[in-house]
Amino acid sequence: MEELQEYLKIEKSWQQDFLYPLFFQEYIYTLAHDHGLNRSILYESAENLGYDNKSSSLIVKRFIDRMYQQNHFIISSNSNSSNQKKFLGHNKNLDLKIISEGFAVIVEIPFSLRLVSSLEGKELVKSCNLRSIHSIFSFLEDKFSHLNYVSDILIPHPIHPEILVQAFRVWVQDVPSLHLLRFFLYEYRNWNSLITPKKSIYTFSKENQRFFLFLYNFYVYKYESMFVFLRKQSSHLRSTSFGALLERTHFYGKREHLVVLFRNDFQSTLCLVKDPFIHYVRYQAKSFLAARGTPLMMNKWKYYLVNFWQSYFYFWSQPGRIHINQLSNYSLDFLGYLSSVRLTFSVVRSQMLENSFLIDIAIKKFDTIVPIIPLLGSLAKAKFCNALGHPISKPVRTASSDFDIIDRFGRICKNLFHYHSGSSKKKSLYRIKYILRLSCARTLARKHKSTVRAFLKRLGSELFEEFFTEEEEVLSLIFPRASSPLRRLYRERVWYLDIIRISDLVNHD
């Protein structure tokens, strides 16, 4: 426990004891609402409510007082639905929205100062390529062929609001700020929806995503920092005797808390060793743990995580929900790709004097393909096709100009091809292009009250040029005529290092 406390210890210089007065500074709300510093939400609200622009601190004080006074409408047992509706509908929650926007900026200050302090005197190589989603797959391409097992992990949710408040006490010791945070967390009962990857975020979280994203990132930070601590400590634990003794050695005492390390009980059987074959990858709330080892070792990691969630976050999870799969027989559904490690066999002829030998060589190869069925489901949900994959028109687009319709459909097609350029089998992507192209033609024909055949005959190749991908445009200039080398080149996987977000059509989890 002492080692864990040292690991999480924060210096006093990083703790901000006086954040609450910043709530009464008008420039905080200017930064929160308008990054261009043209007009702040506080000025706009003051005009609507009849306040003077110069009295920003008084406005915020009245907002905070009114929030605490009106809170009894919700927590009182005698309140009726009309009172709740009155409070929740009060000027679209303007008071709470303004304060929470400023709160999102203020609570980031301790973390920013900590980051600046940790980077002092260090020269870091800035690389924007590491921000790309495709950089994850290039990492997996190098590492996965050497691993044996993978386990899908969903970050547990929901977490109790009081756990977040207690975690904030390590960073912020300003009591009024902690009370205000507790008020926000209990006021917005839908805040847990942000932790769920695909559940909708309700009105407030859409208006002030910065506040909720900060809470979620802080929650993930606490989860992953403890996970890294367990990873570092496990690298120090190994038996110097036989493998059977290793399996009988309990790495951590789980009777009370997972993080209590009984190093003195088996100090003679431990030595310092580093295991580089455990990898952890996360995007949003979905992550996975891959390792090279035995199923028993992966099972230990699984129970470590389950006990950690129970002891630290008070989240009760079932170990059976965390599945351990062998990479050779499993496809990992992650970031819109089905990733797997498959064996490719090749025959090598070896000649020794007068004798020749045929040697079969098995090579592990990282393979990525596009899951066509979920992608078709996303297109059907977006009304580009029906449930069977047949293209349909989009009536909502008929009010736009022909150029805007063609440009929008073309950009969607190019973005999908651009994101899935790392697929080793692009044949399924041509079906997606066919659906989008014919859906565009049906939309234009519906707008002009014509048939698709007549409309395609009138436009000719102009419609199809908008659906050319970047690779097709470049390769068509290099190779004017279709050739076998061109087709082989286009089938190769390409990872782009400029993709920093995932499309809603791709994110079908």
UniProtKB/Swiss-Prot annotation:
UniProt keyword terms in alphabetical order: Chloroplast, mRNA processing, Plastid, RNA-binding, tRNA processing
One of the GO BP terms on file: RNA splicing
InterPro entries, A to Z: Domain_X (IPR024937), Maturase_MatK (IPR002866), Maturase_MatK_N (IPR024942)
A GO CC term attached to the entry: chloroplast
Compartments (UniProt record): Plastid, Chloroplast
GO molecular function: RNA binding
PANTHER family the UniProt entry points to: MATURASE K (PTHR34811:SF1)
Family: Belongs to the intron maturase 2 family. MatK subfamily.
Functional summary from the UniProt entry: Usually encoded in the trnK tRNA gene intron. Probably assists in splicing its own and other chloroplast group II introns.
Name of this chain's protein: Maturase K
Organism: Banksia cuneata (Quairading banksia)
